[in-house]
Swiss-Prot record:
The lineage of its organism: Eukaryota, Viridiplantae, Streptophyta, Embryophyta, Tracheophyta. It is found in: Mitochondrion. Keywords: Mitochondrion, Repeat, Transit peptide. Residues 1-20 form a transit peptide. GO terms for cellular component: mitochondrion. GO terms for molecular function: mRNA binding. Belongs to the PPR family. P subfamily. It comes from Arabidopsis thaliana. This is Pentatricopeptide repeat-containing protein At1g07590, mitochondrial. NCBIfam families: PPR. Gene3D superfamilies: Tetratricopeptide repeat domain. PANTHER family: OS12G0527900 PROTEIN, PENTACOTRIPEPTIDE-REPEAT REGION OF PRORP DOMAIN-CONTAINING PROTEIN. Its main location: mitochondrion. PPR repeats lie at residues 165-199, 200-234, 235-269, 270-300, 305-335, 339-369, 374-408, 409-443, 451-485.
């Protein structure tokens, strides 16, 4: 019976392993904000996370040591992977390919490349089962990650000829791209064409990501042209990257153009496609369109994918749909393992629909069930209180945070600045902004949607006071993140000039050059500003 289960798992893990996702860390990936906190919780398409898979096996077997991956992960420093495999076999468990693929996928996700390489070296050396192309591909991948491209090339020549095939070449190209050796990667792609091998869409995904940095964006068109010339099979993940790049630039037209390109290529959109579309329109405050795409998510969702459900909670919160939000949260709560992140998203979503009591209940439930382990957990409740100007409650959370030994970060102070501004404590708001600026804030945080929306709310508070100077200072922040492409962002700034009764002849020009389309409110505010012309 165990052999049958193992064979079924092996097939499943083999398929997952072939579809190596673009979530593997690379410098360019981080530069373009492909992170949970920035916009979209995740772009993975698997129905269960590796953590859930292992937790499931623990429950089944009643003993965590019956999961090979966990045995390897729990090895003390200095103890070899070989010893874990020997003890595994000593307990009567055969080493199956499925167990190895699962372990490799988890080790990759955890960034434990050295352990992954140890595992593959042992598998190649001891040959506990019949080896295939995937084992050599894994060996090549982690050799390059730890020892560089030159060692990877040497290893490639020593791989048995029958396995120097399409998969291995694709992995070598991807490894070169991950190491930033683009010219060498292109040379290997040329060799693949000569050998008649197809280039995987994952290679082009990497090329697009490498060229997504500022100053290199024009090269993406060449990557797509090369992909077409190579007759590579279009893949949904490629279009997701293109859509996400445009969404991060707050370019709704660009997102829709990439989506249209997907449909023209005959690629079927999935739940992730609609998640990106719905979130992009929700952030742009185009709620009717966002609601339509949210309905498409509901129609296309496959199984209980926690990442999609997290996105649905965010969307229902923004759309004010409390009933649907509660339904989605009940589905998530039914999982064996509920992440702290899901609790935080639910807390913020219920607060958005106006149910503060429920938001507080969920945060306390998370505190009791998951424990308080990081500043982000406190920041979540802080954001809830500060958006409503409940500064006394926010101060209570801040004291609990520092009292438990957690250090406030720039996000903490940005939330407190908003809370003070909402409570009309403008001097204190400025002090908190200054304290946050004295702390390091990563580019990904500074350009994330929650940060930008909080900053815009502070601008609106200063605008109500007619404080043009501080409104302009904060506006510069959102401008650098290209959040100023929305008319409502400029409208907030224009209100500061109206309240201050100050004339500026360049406001309309700034708006147009900033990439925003004036709406009816923009024109009305600009007419009011003109009244103060000297």
């Amino acid at each position: 019976m165990r052999s049958i289960i193992a064979l079924m798992r092996q097939r499943e893990y083999f398929v997952q392993a072939i579809r190596r996702t673009t979530c593997v860390a690379s410098p360019a990936l981080n530069q373009t904000n492909f992170q949970a906190s920035s916009f979209l919780t995740t772009l993975i398409s698997s129905k269960k996370s590796p953590e859930e898979t292992c937790i499931g096996s623990e429950e089944e077997e009643e003993e965590p040591n019956k999961c090979l991956s966990l045995r390897i992960e729990k090895l003390p420093k200095g103890v070899t992977v070989g010893s874990a495999l020997q003890s595994w076999m000593g307990d009567g468990f055969p080493v199956h390919g499925g167990d190895v693929y699962h372990a490799i996928n988890r080790l990759r996700k955890l960034g434990r490349n050295k352990r992954a390489l140890e595992l593959m070296e042992w598998i190649i050396r001891e040959r506990p089962y019949r080896l295939g192309e995937l084992e050599y591909s894994y060996l090549l991948e982690f050799t390059v990650k730890l020892h560089g491209v030159s060692q990877g090339e040497k290893l490639f020549t020593r791989v048995p000829q029958e396995f120097q095939n399409e998969l291995l070449y694709n992995n070598l190209v991807i490894a070169c791209l991950d190491q930033g050796v683009i010219r060498l990667a292109l040379e290997y792609m040329k060799k693949m064409r000569e050998l008649g091998y197809r280039t995987s869409h994952l290679v082009y995904n990497r090329l697009i990501i490498r060229n997504s940095a500022p100053g290199r964006r024009k090269l993406i068109a060449k990557d797509l042209a090369l992909m077409k010339a190579d007759k590579a099979t279009p893949h949904v993940s490629t279009y997701h990257i293109l859509m996400k790049l445009e969404a991060n630039e707050h370019n709704i037209d660009g997102v829709l153009k990439a989506f249209d390109g997907m449909k023209k290529a005959g690629v079927e959109p999935n739940e992730v496609s609609y998640c990106i579309l719905a979130m992009a329109h929700a952030v742009a405050r185009l709620y009717t369109v966002a609601e339509a795409y949210t309905e498409e998510i509901e129609k296309s969702i496959t199984g209980d994918n926690w990442s999609t459900l997290d996105i649905l909670m965010i969307l229902y919160g923004r759309l004010g749909k409390e009933k649907e939000l509660a339904r989605t949260w009940n589905v998530i709560r039914g999982f064996h393992h509920v992440r702290s992140k899901s609790y935080l998203l639910a807390t913020e979503a219920f607060a958005r629909v106006g149910n503060l009591d429920r938001a507080e209940e969920l945060w306390l439930e998370m505190k009791n069930v998951k424990g308080l382990k990081e500043t982000e957990q406190f920041n979540s409740l802080l954001s809830v209180y500060c958006k409503d100007g409940l500064i006394e409650k926010a101060i209570g959370v801040f004291r609990e945070m520092t009292g438990n030994g957690f250090k406030p970060n720039s996000i903490t102070y940005r939330h407190l600045a908003l809370g003070c501004a909402k409570a009309k404590l403008m001097k204190e708001a400025l002090k908190n902004i200054e304290m946050g600026l004295n702390l390091k804030t990563s580019k990904s945080i500074g350009s994330s949607t929650p940060w930008l929306e909080t900053t815009l709310s502070i601008i609106e508070c200063f605008a109500e006071k007619g404080d043009v100077e501080n409104s302009e200072k904060l506006f510069e922040e959102v401008k650098n993140a290209k959040y100023n492409r929305y008319a409502f962002v400029y409208n907030a700034l224009f209100k500061a000039y109206v309240k201050a009764k100050v004339y500026d002849p360049n406001l309309f020009k700034r708006m147009v050059l900033g990439g925003a389309r004036p709406d009816a409110e923009s024109y009305s505010l600009l007419k009011l500003v003109e009244q103060y012309k000297p």
